[in-house]
């Protein structure tokens, strides 16, 4: 906590004479949480955060191709690590965790014990995001891999039937103010949608009839979120990244359903321009 207090104090003292704009590229699942984090940072520093949200894999490819991003917050560790390996960014830090849940249409009888059978039912429309483009899809396919150990043949069956409704370059967008996952379920395009628990909670706020079913322990898959600062950006980019890693921002992330990552791991070191060792994350 002492490190976080030091960083918050230094952020307050480091307000530039002219406000700077930080270009944030971030996973779509972080939109609500990082919007609130950005508002807190803007109020503290006077700087502006210009954010673009979308599938982490697509954003990573855009940054790799030269997009003008300053900070990249991904729904996995692999994509920011790839940018670091390309020498396009600094170290990668884990700053939040999530879990996969099943968002289920209102009238479907299902619980954690019967979830796998329901997903395998040929009459049930099972949806995921798009693997490689969106880590949520990669995590969902990891669930399918785990299912193979429970029921031989399950992995192939689930992969073949899964409808990749989100996270692709041409995926349909919901109306303004709707979450894409809840929208697809409401429109009847998915009976069960494997997505982040935070996304499922947001969908349920829009339609309280939609169900959230926890994955059974043998199918459970966690998500780790990685943060990196793109080389060549303004000093305020590093300060904003440090704020995301602070306990103050951690409280905001927690309020949106995320679990803490390695918060405060690098704060004092960054103030002395000696970065802490990056966290080791799980590839998708």
Which residue stretches match the model-derived regions?
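Periplasmic N-terminal soluble interaction domains immediately after the signal peptide in Gram-negative
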Residues: 90-91
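Exported/periplasmic ABC-transporter solute-binding proteins
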Residues: 20-67, 74-77, 81-85, 94-98, ...
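N-terminal signal peptide c-region/cleavage motif recognized by signal peptidases
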Residues: 14-19
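Sec-dependent signal peptide recognition
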Residues: 1-8
